[in-house]
Structures are given as C-alpha cells and as structure tokens.
C-alpha cells in the first residue's frame, strides 16, 4: 500500500486583544469584512461569498449582515470588545453592515470612518449599461 501524505492543520492561536478595527469593503458584487488589531494585523475575516451566498445574492444587505456576524463571532474568541469601523465602497450591504456591528452584543463601536477613495478626475468610468 502507498503511504498517505497527512497535512497537519494549522492551530489557531487565541490572542487577547481588547480593541480592534473592522474594515467593511462593500463592492457591487460582494462584501468583505476584515477585523484587525490597532496595528493592522489581521485577526479574522469573512465574506458574503464565503458563507455560501452565490451570484447576485452576495451583494444583498442580508449577506453583508451575516458576514459581519460571522467575523465578529470569530473576533470575540480573541477577546475583542471595542471596535472602530472603516467603510469602503459603494455597495448595497454597506449601511446594513455598520448597523449590525453596532447591534452585536458585547462589542462597543468607538468611531466610524469612510475611507472610500475618490478620484480627482482620474480614470474614465465604464460606459452606461443598456438593458
């Protein structure tokens, strides 16, 4: 019989971090949630597509809410109690994601910033859709 190659799973080390930053990237197609410590080191992340939402369902506000709840439950295991929020992008899940961070028990929101990049007349935008 041939030998099996067994790959050892990486063990998640529990960190004790009191404050974190929630980055919400809401695009037209998906919503990405990343939680970091104050230095910018990633603690955990979650996406709407990674939770099983496929196609146009990824861009819904409900999918964004589920992604936030998933990421915050992982972050609570590391001891995160206070967060700041940085929001980027024009997606539909943006407002819902902010509200669901504030509604989560055991997590206090300290501040909210919009870090969406705005061009000073940069690249030409894509042409209008004709449906």
Curated annotation (Swiss-Prot):
Keywords: Ribonucleoprotein, Ribosomal protein, RNA-binding, rRNA-binding. InterPro entries: Ribosomal_uS11, Ribosomal_uS11_bac-type, Ribosomal_uS11_CS, Ribosomal_uS11_sf. GO terms for molecular function: rRNA binding; structural constituent of ribosome. The gene is rpsK. GO terms for cellular component: ribonucleoprotein complex; ribosome. Located on the platform of the 30S subunit, it bridges several disparate RNA helices of the 16S rRNA. Forms part of the Shine-Dalgarno cleft in the 70S ribosome. Disulfide bonds: none annotated. One of its GO terms (biological process) is translation. This is Small ribosomal subunit protein uS11. Belongs to the universal ribosomal protein uS11 family. HAMAP family: Ribosomal_uS11. Pfam families: Ribosomal_S11. Part of the 30S ribosomal subunit. Interacts with proteins S7 and S18. Binds to IF-3.
């Amino acid at each position: 019989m041939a030998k099996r190659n067994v790959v050892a799973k990486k063990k998640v080390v529990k960190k004790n971090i009191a404050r974190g930053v929630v980055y919400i990237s809401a695009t037209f197609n998906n919503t990405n949630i990343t939680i970091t410590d104050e230095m910018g080191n990633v603690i955990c992340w979650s996406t709407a597509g990674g939770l099983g939402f496929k196609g146009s369902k990824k861009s819904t506000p409900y999918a964004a809410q589920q992604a936030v709840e998933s990421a915050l439950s992982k972050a609570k295991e590391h001891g995160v109690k206070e967060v700041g929020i940085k929001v980027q992008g024009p997606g539909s899940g943006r407002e819902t994601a902010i509200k669901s961070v504030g509604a989560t028990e055991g997590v206090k929101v300290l501040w909210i910033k919009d870090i969406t990049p705005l061009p000073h007349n940069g690249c030409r935008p894509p042409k209008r859709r004709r449906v």
